[in-house]
């Protein structure tokens, strides 16, 4: 048996599964476009507020702090994912892996202390001003 025939014979189940998933997605998208309503009007473009008349604008300006906190959450969440992968393989990695994990945690703590000292975690502006004045002295 040649290599390409062996590869096809080995992966035919995955190929059928992939075709089924793509076919199911195409079927659901096609069915929703056929059965869905096509009327576009003024009421369709208004935000839905549970049957109540809309009050105010749907576009709100958010503080940049929310985006900063979201980015910090994503970064520390990915770091937690790395630590979970290490904890699953702790027996295979031995002491070398343990030391590497400790170094990784130390780097994380250094980053957290830096963010704390800079004031990235402070929500109140007066606390940040006091901390920056103390650092300049």
Curated annotation (Swiss-Prot):
The enzyme's E.C. designation: 7.1.1.-
This protein's assembly is summarised as:
NDH-1 is composed of 13 different subunits. Subunits NuoA, H, J, K, L, M, N constitute the membrane sector of the complex.
* Compartment(s) where it occurs, according to its Swiss-Prot or TrEMBL record: Cell inner membrane
State the taxonomy lineage.
Answer: Bacteria, Pseudomonadati, Pseudomonadota, Gammaproteobacteria, Pseudomonadales
Q: Name one GO molecular function term.
A: NADH:ubiquinone reductase (non-electrogenic) activity
Q: Which UniProt keywords apply?
A: Cell inner membrane, Cell membrane, Membrane, NAD, Quinone, Translocase, Transmembrane, Transmembrane helix, Transport, Ubiquinone
Topology in membrane: Multi-pass membrane protein
InterPro entries documented for this protein:
NAD(P)H_OxRDtase_bac/plastid (IPR023043), NADH_UbQ/plastoQ_OxRdtase_su3 (IPR000440), NDAH_ubi_oxred_su3_sf (IPR038430)
Q: What does this protein do?
A: NDH-1 shuttles electrons from NADH, via FMN and iron-sulfur (Fe-S) centers, to quinones in the respiratory chain. The immediate electron acceptor for the enzyme in this species is believed to be ubiquinone. Couples the redox reaction to proton translocation (for every two electrons transferred, four hydrogen ions are translocated across the cytoplasmic membrane), and thus conserves the redox energy in a proton gradient.
Q: Which gene encodes it?
A: nuoA
Superkingdom, according to UniProt? Bacteria
Q: Which reaction does it catalyse?
A: a quinone + NADH + 5 H(+)(in) = a quinol + NAD(+) + 4 H(+)(out)
Protein family (similarity comment): Belongs to the complex I subunit 3 family.
| A GO CC annotation given for this chain | NADH dehydrogenase complex
Origin organism is Pseudomonas entomophila (strain L48)
Ranges that cross the membrane: 12-32, 66-86, 95-115
Its protein name is NADH-quinone oxidoreductase subunit A
């Amino acid at each position: 048996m040649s290599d390409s025939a062996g590869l096809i014979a080995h992966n035919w189940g995955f190929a059928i599964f992939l075709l089924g998933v793509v076919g199911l997605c195409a079927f659901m998208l096609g069915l929703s476009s056929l059965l869905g309503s096509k009327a576009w009007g003024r009421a369709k473009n208004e935000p839905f507020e549970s049957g109540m008349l809309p009050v105010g604008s749907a576009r709100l300006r958010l503080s940049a702090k929310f985006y900063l906190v979201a980015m910090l959450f994503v970064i520390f969440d990915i770091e937690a994912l790395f630590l979970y992968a290490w904890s699953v393989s702790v027996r295979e990695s031995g002491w070398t892996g343990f030391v590497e994990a400790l170094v990784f945690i130390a780097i994380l703590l250094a980053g957290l202390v830096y963010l704390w000292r800079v004031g990235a975690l402070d929500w109140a502006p007066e606390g940040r001003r006091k901390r920056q004045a103390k650092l300049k002295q």
